[in-house]
From Swiss-Prot:
This is Chitooligosaccharidolytic beta-N-acetylglucosaminidase. The keyword Cell membrane does not apply. Disulfide bonds join 31-59, 36-55, 316-373, 326-331, 478-491, 585-592. The active site is at 249 (charge relay system), 303 (charge relay system), 368 (charge relay system). Keywords: Carbohydrate metabolism, Chitin degradation, Disulfide bond, Glycoprotein, Glycosidase, Hydrolase, Polysaccharide degradation, Signal. Its EC number is 3.2.1.52. Residues 1-22 form the signal peptide. It is an enzyme of class 3 (hydrolase). It comes from Ostrinia furnacalis. Glycans are attached at residues 164, 375. GO terms for cellular component: plasma membrane. One of its GO terms (molecular function) is beta-N-acetylglucosaminidase activity. The record marks 327 as: Important determinant of glycosidic bond specificity. Disruption phenotype: RNA interference of this gene does not cause any visible changes in phenotype in larvae before pupation. At the pupation stage, 20% of the larvae show abnormal phenotypes. They fail to shed their old cuticles completely before starting to form new ones underneath.
Length: 594
């Protein structure tokens, strides 16, 4: 349908800007066969010059929208000049989400202003815009894996001097997504200094997958609260909805747990590099206003060390040679045989439940447990022999399960409900015996092995729900130099946005795709911190966002022109997103190919 409207689009734009001269303009753009072609402007021509972004908005099926809508996406044929100071948002149904709706409305206006390049000043002439928000469930503001994120967006002229935009949704989250889409329908005519808006719009949209996330490891290196909020801001711009906070590990314990203060006092990298309850609440609220749940992970029983030194509840901490006991230094695992450990866990979980109070799920970690580490402890060996267990792989799985069941009970108690729990793939989750240990109704399994791992099919056939984080496409720390020794890191090479985009959960899961809740890009932080965060994540995470929102049947080539634009939009937001191509390619579509 889009190809048939290209001539109409050009006519529509001409009608709106016909009276404006462009004598000083050197270049103009024209839509030709789905590409915006750069042409030398002729001031004597009766055809006014068309700006690049105005051309891109209509020269392909989804305009400049990211992620692409999954339902109807009719962008009409016309752009209207808009007065930036005459945009009003009106909430038609009041309820418990009023504060969130008002915050979203304020942010929407800020997002609209992103269409204006730094240093440009739009003319304050043009039509007024009235945005009407119709939330059918204005009292519902809880995250859930079943929440309705759908929305409908209608834009149409209203008389000679106004444009009406109406967003309808069944939740605040859908409403927020609709505002995000609407903000992307504004472009700046840098030839005439006018803010423009698509005048006739009909969009129906909803995500394919309910879980669309980014994991950030803030234990191996510290990230400022400002950088975390900046990440969530960018996530909201591309409709990602879960910030998975891997907040502790063996290298540091920066989470301020008031019930066990020695953990962070002894475990933080410095007294300043901690996450207080007030700071976490700020992040959680920031995420809620942007439709992003903040999901805590307390990784156990492995990946513990710093902070636990004086508890007598760990084994093999800083053991040497480390390669014999863990996958990276320092080693450390909890001792499941210590009864006192489980009160510690309940206290940590309770402190997390208090501050991460919007989460509907909880991540318990559970990867890379070393049998050799546990087997190095006399007390653990004695416990296993008392229980008539051997010291073999199967018996250590029993010990691990002993820990997991007790930790599970403490998590339910701390959160005050039986919430879904997430575990990483591991020897405990092996499909050959997982149902001996983990109930498929209680646990979601997050896959970090490759996308062709036979474990995926085995887990799906047994009815388990999965989140895909296969490292061969979604580990954003891959492709850098080794941090122990020389050479490249373990999961090299670097993963480009194209591979991220083409990593389809539906293709991986096939007939079991309904059991896949979504996916998540992971940034493990051995070699990243606040100063490198943006470039590691963006714009690659935007590729993940469209894959999980739309699950397109097409590949990255069809999305490239929009991908280049969303990168530019992120930069305008203050995100230091990595450059994908020379800017020349953005201005000359179709020339930069292999």
């Amino acid at each position: 349908m889009w190809s048939r409207r290209i001539p109409l689009f050009i006519f529509g734009v001409l009608v709106l800007i016909l009276s404006v001269a462009a004598e000083d303009v050197v270049w103009r753009w024209s839509c030709d066969n789905g590409k915006c072609v750069k042409l030398k402007n002729d001031p004597r021509s009766s055809e006014p010059a068309l700006s690049l972004e105005a051309c891109k908005m209509f020269c392909n099926e989804y305009g400049l929208l990211w992620p692409r809508p999954t339902g109807e996406a009719d962008l009409g044929n016309f752009l209207s000049k808009i007065n930036l100071n005459s945009i009003e948002v009106k909430i038609l149904k009041k309820g418990a989400t009023d504060d969130l709706m008002e915050a979203a409305a304020k942010r929407f206006k800020e997002q609209v202003s992103l269409a204006i390049p730094r240093g440009s000043t739009p003319k304050l002439t043009g039509k007024a815009v009235d945005v009407y928000l119709v939330n059918e469930n204005p009292n519902e503001k809880a995250f859930s894996l079943e929440m309705d994120e759908s929305y409908g967006l209608r834009v149409s002229p209203s008389g000679a001097d106004r444009v009406n935009a109406t967003i309808t949704a069944n939740s605040f989250f859908g409403m927020r997504h609709g505002l995000e889409t609407l903000s992307q329908l504004f472009v700046f005519d840098d030839i005439r200094d006018h803010l423009l808006m698509v005048r006739d719009v009909n969009i129906s949209d909803k995500p394919v997958y309910p879980y669309r996330g980014i994991l950030l490891d803030t234990a191996r290196n510290y990230y400022s609260i400002e950088s975390i909020k900046r990440t969530i801001e960018a996530m909201a711009a591309v409709k990602l909805n879960t910030f998975h906070w891997h907040i502790t590990d063996s290298q540091s314990f920066p989470f301020v747990t008031t019930k066990r203060p020695n953990l962070y006092k002894f475990g933080a990298l410095s007294p300043q590099k901690v996450y207080t309850k007030a700071a976490i609440r700020e992040v959680v609220r920031f995420g809620l206003e942007r439709g992003v749940r903040v999901l805590p992970e307390f990784d156990a029983p492995a990946h513990v060390g710093e902070g636990w030194q004086d508890t007598d509840l760990t084994v093999c901490f800083k053991a040497e040679p480390w390669k014999s006991y863990c996958v990276e230094p320092p080693c450390g695992q909890l001792n499941p045989t210590k009864d006192e450990l489980y009160q510690y866990l309940e206290d940590i979980y309770s402190d997390m439940a208090e501050v991460f109070d919007t989460t509907d799920i909880f991540h318990m970690g559970g990867d890379e447990v070393s049998e050799a580490c546990w087997n190095s402890s006399d007390s653990i060996q004695n416990f296993m022999m008392q229980n008539r267990w051997d010291l073999d792989k199967e018996s250590f799985l029993k010990l691990w399960n002993y820990f997991q069941q007790k930790a599970q009970d403490k998590a339910y108690k701390a959160f005050g409900k039986k919430l879904p729990l997430i575990l990483w793939t591991s020897t405990l989750t092996n499909y050959k015996h997982i149902d001996d240990y983990l109930n498929k109704d209680d646990y979601i399994i997050q896959v970090w092995t490759t996308g062709v791992d036979p474990q995926i099919k085995g887990l799906l056939e047994k009815g388990y729900r999965l989140i895909m984080s296969n490292y061969d496409a979604l580990y954003f720390d891959c492709g850098y130099g080794a941090w122990v020794g020389a050479g490249n890191n373990w999961c090299s090479p670097y993963i480009g946005w194209q591979k991220v985009y083409d990593n389809s959960p539906a293709v991986i899961a096939l007939e079991h795709r309904d059991q896949v809740l979504g996916g998540e890009a992971a940034l493990w932080s051995e070699q990243s911190d606040t100063s490198t965060l943006d470039g590691r994540l963006w714009p690659r995470a935007a590729a993940l966002a469209e894959r999980l929102w739309a699950e397109p049947a097409t590949s990255w080539q069809d999305a490239e022109y929009r991908m280049l634009h969303i990168r530019e939009r992120l930069v305008r937001m203050g995100i230091q997103a990595e450059s994908l191509q020379p800017e020349w390619c953005y201005q000359n579509e179709g020339y930069c190919y292999s």
